[in-house]
C-alpha cells in the first residue's frame, strides 16, 4: 500500500475527528467573536460584532422571560419564602432582634433618645391601642370567652374581707336601707288588705295557747296601731327601728354573712343571667365609653417620664433566658399564623418591588461578552463534555465513510 492510498484511508477520519471535536468550541467562538464592530474605511464588516454581542439586549430579555416563566414563578417564590420563614428561622431572627434591642437600650442615656422613645410610645398608644380595643369589641366570641374566663376564675371565687364586709354592711344599713326607708317600706306593706290577711293567717296557723290568744285578740288591731304610730310619729318610728337594729346586732350579723357569701351560693340560673348581663354590660361600655376613656387616660400621660422609666427599667432589669425564649416563641407563632394566610399576598406585592426582570436584564446587559463566552465555555467543558466527545466520534465515523468512498472511487 503506497502513501497515497494510506492517506486516503487515514486522513479523512483524522480530519473529521478533529473538526467534530472542536466544532462546539468553534461555534461558541463564532457566536461571540468579534466582541466589537470591525470598521474598515468607514464600512462595518458584516457579522461584526458577533451574534450574541450584537443582540445582547434581546438575549437578556429572553433569558429573563425564561427564568421568570419557568424557574422563578410566583409559586416557586412563595415556596422559597415559606422555607425561609419557617418557625425556627423566625424564632432565631426574633431572638437576634431582641438581643440587639436590649444591648441598644442599655446604651441609651441621652435626652434625644428618650424623646424618640416617648414619641414611639405616644404613637403606638394613640394608634395601636384604640385599634386593638375596637378589634376586641368586634370579636364577639373572643371577648365573651375572656369575660366568662374572668367571671369563673376570679369573680366566683372572691370573698369579702372583714373590713370590706363591714363597709358594705354599713352602706346597706345607712345608705340603702336607713331607718326612714325601712319605715316607709313598712307603711307601704301595712295596707288594710295585708293586715286582714296577716290576721287570718295568724288565726289559722297558731296552735295551743297562742291559738286562744290569736282568736280572742288577733293581730289586726296591733298592726293598725303600729301603722298609725309609724305614720303620725316618723321620727320616733325611725328611732325605734334604729334601736331595734342595734339590739338585734344586725350590723355584725350582716358583716359576718357578707364575709361567708360567694356568688357560687346563688342558683345556677341566677349565675347564668348574671354572666349574660356582665357580657352585655362590658361590651356596651367598651363600645360606647371605652374608647373615649382610653383616649382621655392616654392624653393625660407624661410620655417623656414614661419613656425614661421604661428605659431605666429595661437597662437595670435582669431578663431570664426562659422569658426571652417564651417571648420569641409566642411572637414567632403569631407571625407564622399571619404568614400562613397572608404570605401569598405579600409575595405578590413584593414582586413588583423586587423588579426581578429588570434586575436580570440589567445584569446580563452589563456582563461583558468575553465573560459570557467564558461562562458558556466552562459549562460546555464541565457539564457537556459528552457532547464534545460525541462530536469527535461522529467526525471520525464520517471520515471513515469518506475514506471508503475515496477508496471505492479509486478502485472503479
Swiss-Prot record:
Coiled coil: none annotated. It is a multi-pass membrane protein. It is found in: Cell inner membrane. The keyword Ribosomal protein does not apply. Pfam families: DUF445. The chain crosses the membrane at residues 8-28, 390-410. Keywords: Cell inner membrane, Cell membrane, Membrane, Transmembrane, Transmembrane helix. The keyword Membrane applies. Its main location: membrane. It comes from the Bacteria. InterPro entries: DUF445, UCP032178. GO terms for cellular component: plasma membrane. Belongs to the UPF0754 family. This is UPF0754 membrane protein syc0451_d.
